[in-house]
Regions:
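Active-site-proximal, substrate-binding regions of enzyme catalytic domains
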Residues: 53-79
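Short beta-strand scaffold positions
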Residues: 10, 45-46, 84, 104, ...
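Short, well-structured N-terminal submotif of metal-dependent ribonuclease cores
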Residues: 1-45, 61-67, 129
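Active-site neighborhoods of divalent-metal-dependent phosphate/nucleic-acid chemistry enzymes
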Residues: 81-118
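Regular secondary-structure segments
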Residues: 34-38, 77, 94-98
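Short, conserved alpha-helical segments within structured domains
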Residues: 46-50, 89
Length: 136
């Protein structure tokens, strides 16, 4: 029986070095890795928590505008070799983030909510985000 295909869990620093190309040593390595993922010779999983950290760092540290953050991360998520069972929800969350004043965590919660998966929060943003939620 063949062994299962290896999937790489991609850390925030790899995504940031790839997107920003701001490190002489790690930028080219990140680019090579992401090219391998794009070509299909490697599979990479981009977890929601990594997306959150990428948004935070790009927004707060690099002061990149929301629309650019969303564009960059959406392009990453749409790479052929990127896997994530919640990919469509994360992409939806990025759109919510771009079009609101809510933070990315609230946007992910809203995107993942449904009548059977209700967000509980004191935050009123969820109504504007069209989430299934209950306020206490």
């Amino acid at each position: 029986m063949p062994s299962p295909e290896k999937v790489y869990l991609i850390d925030t620093n790899v995504i940031l070095r790839y997107l920003l190309n701001d490190h002489k040593r790690f930028g080219p390595k990140a680019k090579t890795f992401m090219q391998d993922v794009a070509e299909g010779s490697k599979k990479g999983e981009l977890l929601s928590v990594v997306v959150v950290e990428c948004v935070y760092v790009m927004e707060k540290f690099y002061e990149i505008p929301k629309n650019e953050i969303v564009d960059k991360l959406s392009r990453i998520l749409n790479i052929k070799g990127i896997v994530n069972p919640d990919k469509s929800k994360i992409l939806d969350a990025l759109v919510k983030y771009e079009n609101s004043n809510a933070d990315i965590v609230d946007c992910i919660l809203a995107a993942k909510s449904s009548p059977q998966r209700v967000v509980v929060s004191f935050d009123k943003d969820f109504k504007r985000l069209k989430a299934s939620y209950e306020s206490y």
